[in-house]
Amino acid sequence: MEGPGLGSQCRNHSHGPHPPGFGRYGICAHENKELANAREALPLIEDSSNCDIVKATQYGIFERCKELVEAGYDVRQPDKENVSLLHWAAINNRLDLVKFYISKGAVVDQLGGDLNSTPLHWAIRQGHLPMVILLLQHGADPTLIDGEGFSSIHLAVLFQHMPIIAYLISKGQSVNMTDVNGQTPLMLSAHKVIGPEPTGFLLKFNPSLNVVDKIHQNTPLHWAVAAGNVNAVDKLLEAGSSLDIQNVKGETPLDMALQNKNQLIIHMLKTEAKMRANQKFRLWRWLQKCELFLLLMLSVITMWAIGYILDFNSDSWLLKGCLLVTLFFLTSLFPRFLVGYKNLVYLPTAFLLSSVFWIFMTWFILFFPDLAGAPFYFSFIFSIVAFLYFFYKTWATDPGFTKASEEEKKVNIITLAETGSLDFRTFCTSCLIRKPLRSLHCHVCNCCVARYDQHCLWTGRCIGFGNHHYYIFFLFFLSMVCGWIIYGSFIYLSSHCATTFKEDGLWTYLNQIVACSPWVLYILMLATFHFSWSTFLLLNQLFQIAFLGLTSHERISLQKQSKHMKQTLSLRKTPYNLGFMQNLADFFQCGCFGLVKPCVVDWTSQYTMVFHPAREKVLRSV
């Protein structure tokens, strides 16, 4: 009795102690609690010698089932509920019994239950991926529909079993397959499953966004709007769903949203329509291409304007404060209207580069005359050139993004599924790839990064296997530049500003400095700020690399895990810590006069344990 969902069927048939999955459409929290209570109430079978074959199948009593079949029981014979033994074995994930029944002549696609479902349908409803794989290997047809008109992939979508969705599509089932009503899996997901998944997951397989169903002629976006599924609407708009297609009633998605009076969806659709309309203008397209450059120019001008206001020849700090507030208000309008949301993450990067630009200009115009003959001159020039070089290398170098073709993704999914490894530890549901050791999916870059350290706020790029060593030098030379500017600022202030610190104290001294050169004090504050965070990050990175052999992500993850463990977890005792010299040699890939040799590991394609010849250690993922 499948009823409206598998939960009622499970209760009515009392099919033994298997954990129930989601109810129909994945919205069944209350029913799951009832099933859990019912399962706890099931009596344990102490004497299996007298139980019938249905109950023996439900409980996975292989010897009793084998005894009854060899005694003449027909494995094709359904019970009084029109459910076959293969159905009961499939829903309870009894792999050995399924193999046995098929070897004895069971029909792998036998229909049964109130909804005329196959054993494959039952296994999918409960999310039993190993059972799905086994049935498909024995010839189960995933294109068959049940009594509700759903095929295998539709059921997997409705019950939100992403590994099964990935496996079915990788085995060749079309992501655009329609049910009896002409609805694709994407339509069902957008309409029936409230939330970002599995809509976002399906979109990674490039489904048709603008196909319409048979009855209502709705697109997936129509269905998402009809259900008020804000997350699905957002995903579909991001993927490029059409806003102009009309359904059988002549309604666009916006018309439906206006009828439903869903203000958030109305705002989303109108905003998207406005953005797409702007794409038709050549000037708008040019502005989009130049967003990063314009953001950098805005930052440079804003920082100059702040310094100019502070250095303005006026004793009224109230006037200067009002001018600063006005400046911040005006500059905040530019990113809001002309810079896309994705490029706003580069605002700290623009701030850093603008700071360095005005630091250099201040040194060249104000500090150079006093320090031209000192070693400071060459050191500063070298430091700022090196900083710009390593910033560029950190920004431009591939940090270790893992890439795979469509065919490689499908082969990986099938391989992982059939080896029992298709889970979140080894498979990235965003990139649809097998995750290398020490990798992590960056949600800003939307890609898995090999030997992931962090997504750097100041460079706007991920730090990983490919650019981590450049990042270290970037921090080092930024600290050098700021350190020299701090030194130069004090030299300039001491030689150009008359102060009476010994006579009048600190407060008077500060007032004299502010009155003497607000611009230099402003640059000094910027340099001190950048020196503080860059030096802290540099020391932290060197400690992690040399003494722990860990990345920032690994260190934070281990510290979080340690809080939930009874015994304190030592960060030094990890498989990656090979000692001070070996850690540095491996990280920078350089030896030390033959005393230490680096171990070359390509972390973009390292999926298994690594044997390290230097220390005879086995490296594992943390």
From Swiss-Prot:
One Pfam family cited in the UniProt record for this chain: Ank_2
What's the protein here called?
Answer: Palmitoyltransferase ZDHHC13
Q: Which residues carry this modification: N-acetylmethionine?
A: 1
Residues folding into a coiled coil are none
Q: Which residues lie on this side of the membrane: Lumenal?
A: 313-320, 369-370, 492-518
Q: Which PROSITE patterns does this chain map to? A: ANK_REP_REGION, ANK_REPEAT, DHHC
Q: Where are the ANK repeats?
A: 43-78, 81-110, 115-144, 148-177, 181-211, 216-245, 249-277
Where along the chain is the active site annotated? Answer: 456 (s-palmitoyl cysteine intermediate)
How does the record say this protein sits in the membrane?
Answer: Multi-pass membrane protein
One GO term under biological process is: positive regulation of canonical NF-kappaB signal transduction
Transmembrane domains' residue ranges: 292-312, 321-341, 348-368, 371-391, 471-491, 519-539
Q: Which family does it belong to?
A: Belongs to the DHHC palmitoyltransferase family. AKR/ZDHHC17 subfamily.
Which source organism?
Homo sapiens
Instruction: Tell me, in a sentence or two, what this protein's role is.
Output: Palmitoyltransferase that could catalyze the addition of palmitate onto various protein substrates. Palmitoyltransferase for HTT and GAD2. May play a role in Mg(2+) transport.
Give the matching Gene3D superfamilies. Answer: Ankyrin repeat-containing domain
Q: Which residues form the DHHC domain?
A: 426-476
Residues on Cytoplasmic side: 1-291, 342-347, 392-470, 540-622
Subcellular location as annotated: Golgi apparatus membrane; Cytoplasmic vesicle membrane
Query: What the record says about its domains?
Result: The DHHC domain is required for palmitoyltransferase activity.
EC numbers: 2.3.1.225
